[in-house]
Structure formats: C-alpha cells, structure tokens
Amino acid sequence: KFAREGFFVVLTTRNRVNAAALEQAIGAQGGASMIVELDLASPASISQAFATIRAQAGDPEVVIYNAGYLEGRDLPPEKELLEHIPVDMFDTAQHIASRGPFLVAKEVLPAMRKRGGGSFLISNNASSLRGRKRLTGQSLYYPRVMMRTLAQVLTEEYSEHGVHVANVVIDGLIDSPGTRALARAREHPEIVMNPEKIAEAFYYLHTQDRSCWTHELQLTPYSTKPSF
C-alpha cells in the first residue's frame, strides 16, 4: 500500500530471503524498495540496520513495527503453565515485544521530533489488551502488553512534537497459506483478515489530520466478537 502511494519502502528482516517475494511484488507494481537485515535480539544489529537505512534512504517518515515470534507454540498440552516456560523462550519474546520496539523507537523518534512530524505505528494483537492464560498452540504473547504500554508512553511524550504514535490491535487471523491450512479457517473463511485491508488501515493512520489522531485502532473480522 505505501509503495503504491509513492513511498520508498525499507523492508527489515533477519534474513533477506524472507522479504524477497515482497520486494519483487513491490517492484512488479512499479514501486521501489530495499531489504535491510535486522535482528531484534541484537542492539548492534538494530543500530547498524538504521545506519544503513539513513545512509541509503534517509530518516524514515513512517515506521511500522511488525515483528512476530513463535516461542511457546510448540509446547505440548501438559506444559501450558508458566512454570514450564524456559527462560530463553521468555527472553526471545521480550526482545521482540518489549526491548525491540524500545530500541527501534530510539533510532527513529529523534529525527521525527526534530522534523516535527512522522508516524511510529505498532502492529500488535489482542493479547496486548489484557493478560490471558496461554493455551496449547499459542505463542508466549503476554509480553505484548508492554508493547501497548510503550505506545501509550510514546503518545504522551511525542504527540506534542508532531509525531503520531499508534498501537494497532489485529484481532484475528491474517490471511496466509499457513492460516488457510487451519481447520477453523477452512470451516469459517469469514474469520480470516485481508492483509491488504490491514495495510490500508496503517496508511489511514499515517495520513490522518493531526487535529484528530487515532492512538489505538482495533481491527476485528465482522463475524467474531472483539477482544477486550
């Protein structure tokens, strides 16, 4: 969506192969993009990645923090409780859901503040709204509450400087080959969310008039009850 609207898009990923198809798709529609490798578990990698971005593309006008992890998903039913969560699994979740956005914000917000504009948008999920028991097959998502809290803090700190910060709660299954393979998605295709429409929601946030900014947006399929 952003590339279609004329933005030069920087795709960050731990391994550039992961973003190659998206880079090709952007090019096929006439857009421009580049891939920069970035490991959220490494502060040095984050600093180097943004140094590369600034050198080759300039300071970002909009940053969408969209990072996920699978930690906890493979634990068996008898290991649902917190006492069975390995510390390294928790650390990985914290790197991505808490420390990661903190370090990325430190890289991009100073330039946005000095410029008097920009957007820092966080892609989150319903587990950021309240603590919930982790069920079998679910990732260790409760650290995402910290991601939402960070968005709230940054909203208070940077709105007056013209920087739009928002937490986007994607409350459902995003369409993908893996999602389509799930039994509940096959039985109820209406619960699957269109990723292009999600992208439009992020673009809407970035282009909002500053007289009426949205700081939290929850996207839920029409056929399911919103999470609270």
Where are these regions (language model features)?
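Canonical Rossmann dinucleotide-binding motif of NAD(H)/NADP(H)-dependent dehydrogenases/reductases
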Residues: 1-10
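The beta1-alpha1 cofactor-binding region of Rossmann-like NAD(H)/NADP(H)-dependent oxidoreductases
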Residues: 17, 38-49
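Active-site loop of short-chain dehydrogenase/reductase
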Residues: 31-32, 59-60, 112-125, 160-163
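Conserved mid-core segment of classical short-chain dehydrogenase/reductases
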Residues: 47, 70-91
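Catalytic loop of short-chain dehydrogenase/reductase
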Residues: 85-89, 93, 119-146, 152, ...
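A short, exposed helix-loop element centered on a Lys and neighboring polar residues
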Residues: 105-106
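C-terminal helical subdomain
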Residues: 160-169, 181-228
